[in-house]
């Protein structure tokens, strides 16, 4: 098993579904007990786990650890290291939403998710949150979000 790269799993930014998921309202306790890493949100396609999950500064981050126990996991690890797969997506149970105008941002077309529960994280080809992408490699910060520059 190789050392993972820290990734942003989610933050408060607007996603492709026209909504936002507030990190402050996200419960990660159960997920921390079973930090499963899936491929494309498919149960049964476990490819590893998420190590060192952190909730701070309005975002959830962690390190992806590939178990290399299946051909799929080996392939995903290689593609992740190469950079052809670099996005993750949070599997969430939505517990509460709000249409409060103070919680809406420009371009938002759906209510804000104010309470949720993280139950899985997936390596995906195209994620809903443009900011859910690799944050650092070899100790150097990499910013590839929609409004950021790539060093």
Model-predicted segments: where are they?
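Signature of dsDNA virion morphogenesis modules
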Residues: 1-147
